């Protein structure tokens, strides 16, 4: 990463303050002035992307994240935020490979695992969803969202009793039997 001078560091902090105050346009303006001097500064690009996301300027946010990742491809924060951008817009097909890249870098991100399972489910990839959820539940056996996606997916695969088992575990449904009932 580039070393910045103290004047640029002050400008960066000023831009961060504007971003914290939700004055995203002013923050973008200052971050862009920093990029004039340091055109390949990933933190400035990343923060611009965050500001554009908050302003609902998705294409601009995407461009900033992609440029940031082109400079610093290992930035897990930028990878996850780009995936989140696509996910929040329902662009599951675009989000999925980025989420998978994130999990290759760090596989214990429970939220990223959940979102990956949801993307697979929403893309109607039942076999991939089944394999992914089975593996993910080994790592996160108490995760109710994973159990829900796995249960719904098993119903899609016509594995009704197994699917209902996972859905019951995730929702805490009451099961009634002929002679007794139990709360799970």
Locate the predicted segments by residue.
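Structural marker of alpha-solenoid helical repeat scaffolds
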Residues: 3, 37, 71, 105, ...
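Alpha-helical segment of the N-proximal tetratricopeptide repeat
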Residues: 6-37, 43, 50-54
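Start-of-helix register in tetratricopeptide repeats
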Residues: 9, 43, 77, 111, ...
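Register position in tetratricopeptide repeats
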Residues: 20-21, 54, 88-89, 122, ...
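Canonical positions in the second alpha-helix
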Residues: 33-34, 67-68, 101-102, 135-136, ...
């Amino acid at each position: 990463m580039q070393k910045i001078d103290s004047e640029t560091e002050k400008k960066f902090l000023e831009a961060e303050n504007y971003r914290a105050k939700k004055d995203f346009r002013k923050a973008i303006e200052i971050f862009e002035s920093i990029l004039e001097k340091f055109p390949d500064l990933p933190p400035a690009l990343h923060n611009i992307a965050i500001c554009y996301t908050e302003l609902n300027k998705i294409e601009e946010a995407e461009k900033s994240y992609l440029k940031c990742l082109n400079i610093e491809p290992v930035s897990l924060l930028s990878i996850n935020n780009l995936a989140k951008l696509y996910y929040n817009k329902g662009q599951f097909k675009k989000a999925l490979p980025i989420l998978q890249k994130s999990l290759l870098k760090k596989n214990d991100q429970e939220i990223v695992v959940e979102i990956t399972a949801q993307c697979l489910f929403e893309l109607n990839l039942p076999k991939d969803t089944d394999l992914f959820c089975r593996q993910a539940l080994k790592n996160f056996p108490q995760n109710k969202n994973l159990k829900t996606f796995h249960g719904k997916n098993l119903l899609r695969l016509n594995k009704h009793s197994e699917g209902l088992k996972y859905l019951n575990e995730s929702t805490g449904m009451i099961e009634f039997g002929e002679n007794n009932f139990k709360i799970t």
